[in-house]
Amino acid sequence: MYIIFAYLYVITAMSLVETPERSSMLGAIIGDMAGSIYEFKNIKSRDFEFLSEACEPTDDSILTCAIARALIDVKGRGTHLQRATVYRMKEYFLCNPLPLGGFGGKFFNWAIYNLEEPYGSWGNGAAMRISPVAYVGNSEMEVKLLSQIITGTTHDDPEGLKGGEVTALAVFKALHGATKEEIQEMVRSYYPGEYSVEELHKTYKFEPSCQKTVPEGMQCFFESEDYESAIRNVMYIGGDCDTLGAIVGAVAGAYYGIPEWIQEKALSMMPDYMVEDYEDFKAMYMDK
């Protein structure tokens, strides 16, 4: 009898423990904000104030929200997604042309001159903004297709398309219960090689390409214990910290969930339109 009561007590206590909300979109925005002040001034340390008052969303978060809004517009259907993505990214750029760190030069010209064709980019912007598609696709094949459509609006170089696809698949797998080993196996199938956070801490520098950002960022996730430690690993290796933060934050947010105190702090720092985008996307796709 005592064993039964003890068992029931443990089960009840566990049910009262609030599980961190798993969110790749919010995880990406928070990771971007956390790294925003270290993009051009790396600290190569895990010891820093998480989301200090100086942190703010950069182009990474702005375009993540633009893609989320485009996916809301088309209600999960691939029809007109390319057109909606182009429209929303240009709209969000024009409404927020000078974020902390600025937009990439090629994207800036594409948006400001209202160009229609993609510009052949292999840059890590393809991976920083793609996380919302993981909630919309119902299978890995659908996630790949959505990623290709969205990424191809600007980053039609094979390396750009690959970087967006790997990130989207990693988030999808994390949301659907894959282990780190399974996610790592997928990432290594795209980017063969061995990495370690300690080695990256010693040697890694700012890199704008997908092929020199995505696998390094994924290693920060693989060697983490929770959402916060994954983001701290990003600042420890340095590099393009806001973009790495967005990529790592998306996967870690989907895999671990995000502690409530971090969510509340981030939401209080985000502009109103960004909170609205997140809440609308959450209502349509995350809470279904």
Predicted regions and their residues:
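Structured, active/binding-site neighborhoods that engage oxygen-rich ligands
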Residues: F5, T12-K288
